[in-house]
């Protein structure tokens, strides 16, 4: 995360809501001295007050075989980002920068059992289909008998038990109001511009 505390977000509810709103995450881990990176959509679980993003990977993914013994990982959710031109500032002698929002969760990873994996897939579909309303939601009931179970064999589920949760919302908070608002104006209708104005 960014070292400047002005960009730091520590409100747990805000951070979890951000991940839920940006559920396609990057999973980074080091296992046996080798770095691994994978991507997956997640569903956030509240397990008796313990927060855990559930995810799934193809059985062909290089990280998947390590799920059975577990490992430590970081899950990174990213949101809007934008290049900021110094031409947009009122102040002189500035340099370009990048504004962005991201949240990282660190913890230990364990495999999901078959029932947990099925629940994850059902919940993930429901979560994402809800974003498509008023479209009638897709469910696996629409699939031919046995097809879902057959496809299930091609993936493995995992759960990251969150021990550290941090966010960086870098929106030019370190700039004078005139510079920050000038940059927001320069971005026009870019989604991050509205965040910079508030």
Regions found by a protein language model. Give the residues of each.
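A generic local secondary-structure boundary/capping motif
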Residues: 16, 93-94, 147-150
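Short, surface-exposed beta-edge/turn micro-motifs
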Residues: 22-24, 70-73, 155-157
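Beta-strand secondary-structure signal
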Residues: 54, 74, 106, 157-161
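Short glycine/proline-enriched turns and hinge-like loops at secondary-structure junctions
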Residues: 35-37, 66-69, 172
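Short, structured beta-strand-loop surface elements
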Residues: 59-123
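Short, basic/aromatic recognition patches
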Residues: 2-26
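C-terminal edge-of-domain segments
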Residues: 110-198
């Amino acid at each position: 995360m960014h070292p400047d505390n002005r960009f730091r977000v520590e409100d747990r509810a805000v951070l979890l809501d951000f991940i839920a709103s940006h559920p396609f995450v990057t999973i980074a881990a080091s296992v046996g001295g080798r770095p691994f990176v994978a991507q997956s959509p997640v569903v956030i679980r509240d397990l008796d007050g313990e927060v855990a993003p559930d995810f799934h990977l193809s059985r062909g993914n290089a990280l998947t075989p390590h799920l059975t013994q577990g490992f430590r990982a970081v899950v990174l959710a990213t949101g809007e980002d934008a290049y900021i031109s110094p031409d947009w500032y009122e102040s002189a002698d500035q340099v370009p920068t990048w504004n962005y929002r991201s949240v990282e969760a660190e913890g230990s990873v364990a495999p999901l059992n078959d029932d947990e994996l099925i629940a994850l897939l059902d919940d993930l579909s429901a979560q994402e289909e809800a974003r498509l309303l008023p479209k009638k939601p897709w469910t696996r009931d629409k699939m031919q008998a046995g097809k879902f179970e057959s496809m299930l064999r091609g993936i493995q589920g995992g759960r990251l038990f969150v021990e550290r949760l941090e966010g960086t919302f870098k929106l030019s908070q370190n700039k004078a109001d005139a510079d920050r608002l000038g940059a927001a104006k320069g971005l026009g209708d870019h989604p991050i511009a509205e965040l910079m104005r508030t």
